[in-house]
From Swiss-Prot:
Molecular-function GO terms, alphabetical: RNA binding; structural constituent of ribosome
Keywords from the named record: Chloroplast, Plastid, Ribonucleoprotein, Ribosomal protein
Native source species: Nephroselmis olivacea (Green alga)
Residue stretches of biased makeup (Basic residues): 115-134
Name of the protein in its database record: Small ribosomal subunit protein uS9c
Superkingdom of origin organism: Eukaryota
Chain intervals for the UniProt region annotation (Disordered): 105-134
Family: Belongs to the universal ribosomal protein uS9 family.
Gene Ontology CC terms: chloroplast; small ribosomal subunit
Presence of the UniProt keyword Chloroplast in the record: yes
Length: 134
């Protein structure tokens, strides 16, 4: 498939507890997250913006597609990383040649790291109370 319909192409990305449903449609390069402009939503943070739009930069499609995202769960970092994965998957579905550009840079790798649970008898997940010999 080399083009998108008026409905667009939908893909899902996940990171930690965040889930992002990413839709790309032909347009001017605008990023919309939860019906709000993407830059203020991501608090003007360059790391979040790079994560959310990096896949478009790598494939040199920044000004050709609008990105519409519905995201929920987690924090801003998790949501930005979920958007990154969903957008990369959408671009790969758009054309197979984008996969060769995105895969070596890690855009198509799902990060499985999650918060480790707190264990009883410990203060945090791994932090133990101070040991006393006597």
């Amino acid at each position: 498939m080399d083009h998108t319909s008026s409905v667009g192409l939908r893909k899902t990305g996940r990171r930690k507890c965040a889930v992002a449903q990413v839709r790309i449609i032909e347009g001017t390069g605008q990023l919309t997250i939860n019906q709000r402009p993407g830059v203020p939503y991501l608090q003007y943070n360059p790391a979040y913006l790079l994560a959310a739009q990096g896949a478009l930069d790598v494939t040199e499609l920044t000004n050709r597609y609008d990105t519409i995202v519905k995201t929920k769960g987690g924090g801003l970092t998790g949501q930005a990383e979920a958007i990154k994965l969903g957008l990369a998957r959408a671009l790969c579905s758009l054309h197979i040649k984008h996969r060769k550009a995105l895969k070596p840079q890690g855009y198509l790798t799902r990060n499985p790291l999650r918060k480790e649970r707190k264990k009883y008898g410990l203060k945090k997940a791994r932090k133990a109370p101070q040991f006393s010999k006597r």
